[in-house]
Swiss-Prot record:
The keyword Hydrolase does not apply. It is found in: Virion. This is Major capsid protein 1. Heterodimer composed of major capsid protein 1 and major capsid protein 2. It comes from Sulfolobus islandicus filamentous virus (isolate Iceland/Hveragerdi). One of its GO terms (cellular component) is helical viral capsid. Self-assembles to form a helical, filamentous nucleocapsid mesuring 1980 nm in length and 24 nm in width. Together with capsid protein 2, wraps arounds the DNA and maintains it in an A-form. Capsid proteins probably maintain the DNA in A-form by non-specific desolvation and specific coordination of the DNA phosphate groups by positively charged residues. This certainly protects the viral DNA under conditions such as the extreme desiccation of its host. It comes from the Viruses. GO terms for molecular function: DNA binding. Its main location: virion. The N-terminus projects into a DNA groove. The keyword Ligase does not apply. The gene is SIFV0036.
C-alpha cells in the first residue's frame, strides 16, 4: 500500500531500545541537530535502562507472585500502585512515611496487613538492587511487624529529598551531602551570596 512502506519493515529492529531511541531522536534532532540529539538520546536511554529496566522491572517480576497471592489475579491494580509508590516516594525520595502509606491504602480498602507485608517486601528487594537503600535499612530484615517503625525512622531522619535524588540513589551509596542544586560558583558560599544581596540593596 502506498504510504505504508511495508517493504521497509525488515530493516528496522523492533526492540524496545531502538523504538525508544528512534522516537526521541525524531523529536530532538529538529532542536539540536544530529550529533547532540544522538548523545542526548543515548543518555536518556541509559537512564531509562538503569531505573526502569534494572529497578522497576526486576522489582515487579520479583513481587508479582506475592501480589497475586495477596489479592488474587484480578485485584492487583491498587497493589501495583502501592509498590511503585513505596519504591519511589518512600524508599528513594523519602517523601512519604510508611505509616502514611498504610493509612492511605487502608482508607482505599486494602487490609493493613497486606500493605505492611508489601512495604516490607519492597524494602527487602530494593536492598538487593540499590546500594543506598541497603545502607539505610542496614542488616534488618523487614517484615510486617517492624517495617513501619524502621522505615519511618529512616524517612524522618532524612526527609523529603529532591526528585533527582532517586536517580542518584539508584547508582550509589548515600551521598554525604544532600544533592540539592549547589548553586553557581559565586552563590554557593553564603558570604558572597549575602554580599551580592547587600550590593543590590545599596544600589536600590
Amino acid at each position: 500500500m502506498a504510504g505504508r512502506q511495508s517493504h521497509k519493515k525488515i530493516d528496522v529492529r523492533n526492540d524496545t531500545s531502538t523504538r525508544y531511541k528512534g522516537k526521541l531522536y525524531g523529536i530532538f534532532v529538529n532542536y539540536m541537530g544530529e550529533k547532540y540529539a544522538q548523545q542526548l538520546v543515548e543518555n536518556m536511554y541509559s537512564n531509562y535502562n538503569d531505573v526502569f529496566v534494572e529497578i522497576y522491572n526486576k522489582m515487579h517480576n520479583a513481587l508479582r507472585p506475592t501480589l497475586v497471592k495477596l489479592a488474587g489475579a484480578g485485584a492487583t491494580f491498587p497493589l501495583w500502585q502501592l509498590v511503585n509508590e513505596a519504591i519511589y516516594a518512600v524508599y528513594l525520595t523519602h517523601k512519604e512515611t510508611a505509616s502514611f502509606l498504610v493509612t492511605k491504602y487502608v482508607a482505599r480498602g486494602v487490609p493493613a496487613m497486606t500493605v505492611k507485608t508489601l512495604l516490607a517486601e519492597v524494602g527487602n528487594q530494593l536492598k538487593e538492587l540499590v546500594p543506598a537503600v541497603a545502607e539505610q535499612i542496614g542488616s534488618v530484615t523487614l517484615d510486617h511487624t517492624n517495617v513501619v517503625s524502621t522505615v519511618d525512622n529512616i524517612v524522618t531522619s532524612m526527609p523529603a529529598l529532591p526528585n533527582s535524588y532517586a536517580g542518584v540513589l539508584m547508582k550509589t551509596k548515600v551521598p554525604t551531602v544532600t544533592p540539592h542544586y549547589a548553586g553557581t560558583g559565586t552563590f554557593s558560599s553564603m558570604e558572597s551570596a549575602y554580599k551580592a544581596l547587600e550590593d543590590i540593596e545599596r544600589g536600590l
